[in-house]
Amino acid sequence: MNQKLLKLENLLRFHTICRQVHSPSQRRLLAWCRHGFAPASSVWRDLLGARSWQTDMLIGSALHQHRLLVTKKEKRPPRSQLSPVKTKKEVEVWVGMTVEDLASAMAKDIDCVYEALLNTAIDVDSLEANSHLDEVWIKEVIKKAGMKLKWSKLKQERIRENKDAVRRPGTDPALLKPRSPVVTVMGHVDHGKTTLLDKLRETQVAAMEVGGITQHIGAFLVSLPSGEKITFLDTPGHAAFSAMRARGAQVTDIVVLVVAADDGVMKQTVESIQHAKDAEVPIILAINKCDKTDADPEKVKKELLAYDVVCEEYGGDVQAVHVSALTGDNLMALAEATIALAEILELKADPTGPVEGTVIESFTDKGRGPVTTAIIQRGTLRKGSILVAGKSWAKVRLIFDENGKILNEAYPSMPVGIIGWRDLPSAGDEILEVESEPRAREVIEWRKSEQKEEKGKDDLKIMEEKRREHQEAHRKAREKYGSLHWKERSYIKFLERKQQRPLKPKEKVERQSNVLPIIIKGDVDGSVEAILNLLDTYDASHECELELVHFGLGDISENDVTFAETFDGVIYGFNVEAGSAIQQSAAQKGVKIKLHKIIYHLIEDLQEELSSRLPHTLEEYPIGEASILATFTVTEGKKKIPVAGCRVQKGQLERHKKFKLIRNGQVIWKGSLTSLKHHKDDISVIKTGMDCGLSLDEEKVEFKPGDQVICYEENKVPTKTSWDPGF
């Protein structure tokens, strides 16, 4: 209304001015101006201004009352004329909704959702229309859109369908058929496990293993003279492969615990017992090396009582068999005990329907691609079967046994090699058969998306933790600097930045010399896993940082050499090879490649490499020892110098070596001599039995009769890493 009045007022003023211009008096003034007889500017302004002022006064007085009346009315309009309060739009959401679902629920374009998620921790580029959003991101989008969130009562029903493959439920008892037992041989290193298996199957597996130590799991089907069959898993016994032993216990029916009669219970023996108990697998005790003269089987049984392994002789249910793997004595009794226990367990499986199994080991073969060793636990495996394991799948091209013989079918309890995997599954992964390749891809995609979602949740937790840490640091900073003057605050911050200054070149070299980047390559998945588990025990980072740059399977490649060159690292290979071209390339780039076939040697080599990165230490080597018999002072100029009269007890004192003074077993001084005399002659060496006088480079030190003077030299010696891998 005020705007309209203002326009009316301006219009009336303009109209008044126009009338004045066209009046006779005004026309006369304009004519004078045209003919050059214009009056002075002040007179002109007075004439026109007076009339304008009078007109303005008339218009102002006419409109003043009306303007006030309108303004009063506009100040408080009637309640009925007030615009209604806008309420936020309510959006119904549910757990697990996709980007497309959220956009549809908001009645917005899908780009609005992407725009709302910009500048957040979520990777917008990786989002698709069917990507599932966590609750925190759903709330964020709704908040930025200025809407109100409402959780759907049916949100549980809207969660996406689980598309994973799972094991079948219980089987009809009528379909169950007896199967061979799967037996895992466990025990301490070099207690004779592989030799025992070698005798049972009459092969030379033990001779094929480097150093007689099994490096990774072997699965074998052993046929006994009685016609019975037993599947044996031979797991390594030394500390590096405890994870592989644990995996063996997860797929086994019976554990044969091998303990040497002369060594007794060892560290890995105890670990094997724990693995069996955790998996709730019964134990058969095989006391090996009973042919030795110092064998004591009864001592072994008594030692095992402390670990709740009670033999039948002591009222327990654990069968104990005394054997000699070297001579073959009593091995049939061990096999019969295994079969007897299997009969008690009534081991059965369903050979029909989709296949179920477990990956025992996996590796990459140059000519055949990814290969797995597996134990079939249910169903019958055939060529052409579609399998999924972990996040990889296969269309079976080839099935073979432990001897390389091609098989058409594989039944429950059979150990087989499988070829046809698209990617390499991990040892311990569950094998499941699905109906088709599209279904296999669907399962893999589901598992990858689940893993990605879990990773997103973990990342969110980490971000939240970092946010809390940042807030706490900010709060502490405010408490620290809040009461200080800005000059004091600036000075303190300057000192703190100075302490965190960039390293100088020399310091940088010293810092880098205390870091060892390494690359690990192994022949099979289980071996690499065992090495990584060993590296997890590294606890000497205060001496030298151990950085794992890369690990993988297969022979050393050019990429590995490039990695090592980039990080100035060392390549360690276990049961793999490096071609001549690779070795030549590594030599040109200054990259070390270290290949080993026994894990002990690899770890020892790694310890030596770590030790080489450590600074040398100084060790004292005594040269001679003398006792102080008397003390006196000698005047030189204005100084009085204390002198000790000594007699050499051991070795000799050399003038230019280092000395230390010991009193009551405590070192009270270290340094050099200023003089060494025999009678009045300066000499450089005093031998055993001779008397001498000596003075120190520190005059404040007081001698006392009975003190010991030690002459020594310092030598630099290499420092050994304190890391103990547990062998």
Curated annotation (Swiss-Prot):
Residues binding GTP: 187-194, 234-237, 288-291
Modification Phosphothreonine, positions: 688
Transit peptide region: 1-29
GTP-binding is among the record's keywords: yes
Stretches the record annotates as G3: 234-237
Family: Belongs to the TRAFAC class translation factor GTPase superfamily. Classic translation factor GTPase family. IF-2 subfamily.
HAMAP family with a match to the protein in the record: IF_2_B
Protein name: Translation initiation factor IF-2, mitochondrial
Source organism: Mus musculus
